[in-house]
């Protein structure tokens, strides 16, 4: 064994101790070790073992054995069984990798740049075998989650993993016997106010997940009764190029809105699987710009093509304030915002708009004239369409409440 490996072996207990201390310092869930010395000792033992196996196997680039991988998986099981969260699991893996690389760097620096061949050997070994170890650890972790968590909570964890780019998503999907698609539509259903009664929509979400077989998670809004249902709906690759939402998304949104019984708004954004974290932010912004709809199956998911003007306006306060002033000027009239909404939703077809409002076409005409009187803007003009349709959507989205 060369001098780099000898130095790593000499420093293994010290470096393992430093790793345990880093867990205590940087990961809050590990602070319970202060009262659980056995757990701390077991982690110390594992950290020393992993460093020694690195030193034993890397000189001739030998792989971790099946027994090694089973031991690593068992550590993942122990930590999951102790209640470690997925976020902490990810922190542990990142911190461990960073510290192992620091161990190697410090050992090489202590030799003043010598033993380059040994440094290349250990680094060549570390990347592929580190990946195998991480996979084994994740699989052990998921084994316990599958045993401990109810089905809907497993699905919610899969949704969160997909939306944060956590590699554990593949293991969770396999445990649920689901195949991860190449493309998805991230859908955010915004619910400003949950139904009365104090329940947390568990039944509605469980029904939705089992019916549509999609990962979904409820995210409550702090300090309110509202929140978001976020679903990851598989779609075909061509859906990314279409301006409308996939049919599967529309079906899911309609089912949830009907079961919810409260006004809600939905936004959706499509993306390849590895770009879901960014598409979540887009879908969330779209849902905040979309109008709140009545709780029926007719609630539809909005896309960027539907509300791109409103998205832009929301980022320009001076324009948003002007539109808000136009909206306030409509307040003296009879149901003018609702009337304009129907008028534009029916492509300015007077007969269809009047029928949807259950009024006579002449009543519709009167209301449109009243809009022009109050705002100085003709609803049927190009300027009126551009301005008043945006006013209506902003008002119905709840942006100005």
Regions found by a protein language model. Give the residues of each.
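Alpha-helical/coil-rich non-catalytic "connector" segments in signaling and regulatory proteins
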Residues: 1-156, 334, 338-401
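Short amphipathic alpha-helical segments
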Residues: 40, 159, 170-173, 202, ...
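Hydrophobic alpha-helical membrane-association signature
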Residues: 50, 92, 126, 201, ...
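Glycine-rich, flexible loop segments associated with nucleotide phosphate handling
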Residues: 116-124, 204, 245-252
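Amphipathic alpha-helical interaction/coupling elements
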Residues: 129, 157, 161, 200, ...
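Signal-transducing coiled-coil/dimerization helices and immediately adjacent hinge/linker segments
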Residues: 139-190, 339, 360
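Cytosolic nucleotide-utilizing catalytic cores of signal-transduction proteins
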Residues: 172, 178-179, 183-184, 194-198, ...
